[in-house]
């Protein structure tokens, strides 16, 4: 037992003096390995009596635990010292913020579409999509647009052939929805549309959001209330809003909606009206039982008014100096 005590004291002494992890590992092998000094003490068990063996075995195990615990503590201490020395050498200020990436922002047109979708989504309107290459039935005929209407002219519409064209409005999505779903319906249809026009306030491709509600006893007062609330929500102002009588082939009665600008002038922002009975009949909905309202707005137009942009073409020129303003 005296010999075991001396071995443990010797081990603890060399562990305390060790200055690196490799030396500590060598000490572990020297004392606790298969041929280590403490392990060899177990060979003495054979020369002991039955009464002495339990006490001796317990002493050897305690010796192993004492040496192992000291090794573990010394290893942890050396690792902590190495880390501290490394941090000092590299002179890291951990309080400094990390490097950040130059993150882009949403395009202003995308921001506007999301804002519109959020407002109408809270009122139960579902977003619907449709093809951008459209046939004349869904783009014109079903919308009560006569064969000789100016909107069908080549100078307004991009035709692939007399029956197929790039859609001039997203109203075709409303027709397709009414063909496959029965009232009550509440939908909005955002998307790209195409018209043969290009100047400071028009581009050949632009974005529209059209809305449709069809159910029993839908009336114009509901339409006015929803659009009035939308415009005040969108512009975040208690705007003065007016509805002017107008004409659209697919609605009757029809109106254009204006808001009072900061310059004291009325600004047109969207069109609307009660769905024409002929439109409902074209998709198999009984206009005697159901009524509905529809509205449409140009996304770029609303975006220009909200952010004070004067030239529509700025949205499509990808000038980072312009786009970074909307982060």
Curated annotation (Swiss-Prot):
Q: Which residues bind Mg(2+)?
A: 252
- Which species does this protein come from? Shewanella frigidimarina (strain NCIMB 400)
Q: Gene Ontology cellular component?
A: cytoplasm
The EC code for this enzyme is 6.1.1.20
The record's subcellular locations are:
Cytoplasm
Q: Check the record and name the Gene3D superfamilies matching this protein.
A: Bira Bifunctional Protein, Domain 2
Q: What does the note under cofactor report?
A: Binds 2 magnesium ions per tetramer.
This one is known as: Phenylalanine--tRNA ligase alpha subunit
* Gene Ontology biological process: phenylalanyl-tRNA aminoacylation
Chemical reaction(s) catalysed: tRNA(Phe) + L-phenylalanine + ATP = L-phenylalanyl-tRNA(Phe) + AMP + diphosphate + H(+)
Cofactor section: Mg(2+)
Q: Summarize the subunit comment.
A: Tetramer of two alpha and two beta subunits.
Q: Where are the transmembrane segments?
A: none
